[in-house]
Amino acid sequence: MNDVELVVLADEFGKPSGTAVKSEVHTTDTPLHFAFSCYVRNNKGDLLITRRALSKKTWPGVWTNSACGHLMPGETPEQAVARRVPHEIGISQDKLVNIACVLPDFSYRAVDSRGIVEWEICPVFTAAVTDDALLPEAEEVDSLVWVEPSKLIHAVHSAPFAFSPWMVEQLQHEALRTALTTS
């Protein structure tokens, strides 16, 4: 069995153009590739935010949205969310429900303090969990906390440097803020 994880590369028109090994793709010259971001809420309406593991290649130890990931070859963004989010936050797949795409055309490019680039076509999703007892994957998540969405939005606006650049940019979109603050 081949355990090499691939990411799907994109051309300048946003179409798949090949694959690259995930562990090798994030450099100072990262090619455009497909990913997703997801914001997860519990039954109280609180939002899960996670602190990226210190071992992450990009933005280690930074607070960010609930989960992010890359599409595998042949996979839709929705399928990637259903596969990857439960793995990262530590729940069974059947406990992740109500997956909805809020920002289908979101993309961004950001450079971290070491010059490593993230450049992604990254649809943004919301989802809910039916059980908020989580066991996060240590290679992905250092810690996590449930917060009121309005408090998170205020914190990101007040101190954007404390959060991932993609989350800061995503929360500038009214459609996402509305989806996170309404039931």
Curated annotation (Swiss-Prot):
PROSITE patterns: NUDIX (PS51462)
Originating gene: idi
Reactions accelerated catalytically: isopentenyl diphosphate = dimethylallyl diphosphate
Location of the Nudix hydrolase domain: 31-169
Role description: Catalyzes the 1,3-allylic rearrangement of the homoallylic substrate isopentenyl (IPP) to its highly electrophilic allylic isomer, dimethylallyl diphosphate (DMAPP).
Classification via Pfam families: NUDIX
Domain of life: Bacteria
InterPro entries given in the database record: Idi_bact, IsopentenylPP_isomerase_typ1, NUDIX_hydrolase-like_dom_sf, NUDIX_hydrolase_dom
Annotated catalytic residues: C68, E120
Enzyme Commission numbers on file: 5.3.3.2
Pathway where it operates: Isoprenoid biosynthesis; dimethylallyl diphosphate biosynthesis; dimethylallyl diphosphate from isopentenyl diphosphate: step 1/1
Cofactor details (free text): Binds 1 Mg(2+) ion per subunit. The magnesium ion binds only when substrate is bound. Binds 1 Mn(2+) ion per subunit.
Binding site for Mg(2+): C68, E88
Organism: Corynebacterium diphtheriae (strain ATCC 700971 / NCTC 13129 / Biotype gravis)
Protein's name according to its UniProt entry: Isopentenyl-diphosphate Delta-isomerase
Gene Ontology CC entries for this record: cytoplasm
Cofactors, names only: Mg(2+); Mn(2+)
PANTHER family (alphabetical): ISOPENTENYL-DIPHOSPHATE DELTA-ISOMERASE
